[in-house]
């Protein structure tokens, strides 16, 4: 059996010669350009720089593609939101052209008025030691009042000036963002407390006051007529 199991002695000599030839290759290479300039470069370093350059270009292209996709998706979301608002909320041309901007400005002013009314510095809370707020000041500067009152004033002003847009906004919010059971319960409580309670009670009080006023005026007129008749007689 031969001593050289995997290869013959000639093959081993050839491999050693190739390795020696590769080791003897120069690590710097000179090249003469067409302009007459001579460039000296290292082939391994040049190859490595080409690899880094290609990798950097690839990463740049990936980032540019991702950024383009993100811009396109953001633009589509903005366009969809604008179309959704125009279709469901801002669908009254008269209010959009004439009343929407003034109503928004006045609603913002009402919001800041609510912030002023609920500011503690306007109701005697000057310092920790010297505090003398009134009952109305305590009521208006409470946490629920500071949270609800500015929004309520802004909502009332916006509803009075642009009722169609305000109604569409409330209906869209209830339909698309709240559960149906919660909306039904909310409307039931609202009807029970406000429509059938406060509103109906205030209407009855106003009607009673109006009837009393008319009866009083009628009795005064009858008295004046009776006095005039007595004077004529």
Swiss-Prot record:
Signal peptide: none
Mitochondrial matrix topological domain residue ranges: 118-138
Transmembrane segments: 99-117, 139-158
Membrane topology: Multi-pass membrane protein
The keyword Metal-binding appears for this protein: no
One GO CC term, this protein: mitochondrial inner membrane
Stretches assigned to the Mitochondrial intermembrane side: 1-98, 159-233
Record region (Disordered): 1-26
The entry's keywords: Membrane, Mitochondrion, Mitochondrion inner membrane, Transmembrane, Transmembrane helix
Polar residues biased stretches: 1-11
Subcellular location: Mitochondrion inner membrane
Keyword Glycoprotein set for record: no
Basic and acidic residues composition bias: residue spans: 13-24
Subunit structure: Component of the mitochondrial contact site and cristae organizing system (MICOS) complex.
Family designation: Belongs to the apolipoprotein O/MICOS complex subunit Mic27 family.
Main function: Component of the MICOS complex, a large protein complex of the mitochondrial inner membrane that plays crucial roles in the maintenance of crista junctions, inner membrane architecture, and formation of contact sites to the outer membrane.
The protein, known as: MICOS complex subunit MIC27
Gene: MIC27
